[in-house]
Design a protein with these regions (language model features):
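Conserved adenylate-forming
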Residues: 57-70, 74-116, 128, 138
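Short aromatic/basic micro-patch
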Residues: 8, 47-48, 65, 88, ...
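Adenylate-forming
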Residues: 9-20, 36-37, 119, 145, ...
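Structural core segment of the AMP-binding/adenylate-forming
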Residues: 1-52
Length: 168
């Protein structure tokens, strides 16, 4: 329903996307988050490698100005409280959420913290910590796909001070 034309994919997700790409007729370009030398064999057509695209740029990026109320991203909900839907976030809402999370009455993040979100990155606690942790100087521990009890325990043992999760 978003009618996206470009899909950016982590290496771990290539097998999943290979199975699903046929039901996504609007996707014209797949960008894999790697470089060509680390790109595995794939049945995906018309792929580009993200790191190669970056290395081809001059480095003289010219920032554009925009309205803080413009959408900067869209996340899809799984429908926990209703039908699945796309939710747009504005530049302003992302900044305000990151600032709010660092406040003493919220997470009170500081450079002494190690933050580990165990929620998906499309969850508000997942995407916002990607902004609030660097803003406060906190370390950010990303568990990745290894969400077994043993793996989480080992990550917590590294000195994690704040874990973000969902109570359900």
């Amino acid at each position: 329903h978003a009618e996206d034309k470009i899909l950016m994919v982590d290496l771990d997700m290539i097998p999943v996307i290979e199975k699903l790409i046929g039901s996504c007729p609007k996707i014209a370009q797949v960008i894999i988050l790697t470089d060509r030398k680390n790109m595995p064999e794939t049945a995906l057509k018309n792929i580009l490698c993200y790191e190669d695209l970056l290395s081809e740029q001059s480095g003289n990026f010219e920032w554009i100005s925009g309205d803080e109320r413009e959408a900067c991203g869209i996340c899809y909900t799984s429908g926990t409280t209703g039908n699945p839907k796309g939710v747009t976030y504005t530049h302003r809402s992302n900044v305000l959420h990151a600032l709010t999370v660092t406040n003493p009455d919220m997470l009170n993040l500081s450079s002494n913290d190690k933050v580990m979100p165990v929620v998906p990155l499309f969850h508000a606690n997942g995407w916002s910590v990607g902004y609030s942790a660097p803003l406060s100087g906190s370390s950010l521990i990303l568990p990745g796909r290894e969400m077994t009890p043993q793996a989480l325990y080992e990550m917590l043992e590294t000195g994690v001070t704040i874990t973000l999760a969902v109570p359900t």
